Regions:
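Amphipathic, coiled-coil-like alpha-helical segments
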Residues: 1-9, 24-26, 31-32, 37, ...
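Short hydrophobic/aromatic-rich motifs at helix boundaries and adjacent loops
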Residues: 9-14, 47-49
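Short, charged, low-complexity loops and linkers
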Residues: 11-24, 55
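Short helix-adjacent coil turns
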Residues: 18, 41, 45-52, 67-68, ...
């Protein structure tokens, strides 16, 4: 992928605007809650619930953009706007990307 895992400037801008301590809390909240969004992607895919799937993908996309996790945001955008159902491999890929993004965000937050 051409995009960086985390756009440093976006993350730094967020820290400058909201404060480093608050961003650290946001990152931890995201790390705790985002896996549930991936679980929602999986369950809505297996249940054929297209709207729930799109909503979970949209949330991942929005959070990704907020933190500068551009690859995560792009993968989520593709899931959100793409046809439904999607191949389960796409959900597996976003789950793996989420793990990478969370690790990188935690490292940046703790600077």
């Amino acid at each position: 992928m051409d995009q960086p895992l985390i756009d440093d400037q976006t993350f730094q801008d967020l820290q400058n605007t909201a404060g480093a301590d608050f961003v650290d809390e946001l990152v931890e909240t995201f790390a705790e809650e985002a896996p549930a969004l991936v679980a929602e992607l999986r369950s809505s895919l297996s249940e054929g619930a297209a709207e729930d799937f799109r909503r979970a993908a949209h949330s991942l996309k929005s959070n990704g953009h907020t933190f500068g996790a551009l690859r995560l945001a792009e993968q989520a955008r593709v899931l959100e706007l793409g046809g439904f159902p999607v191949d389960v491999a796409a959900v597996d890929a976003i789950a793996a990307e989420l793990e990478l993004a969370i690790a990188a965000l935690r490292e940046l937050a703790r600077g």
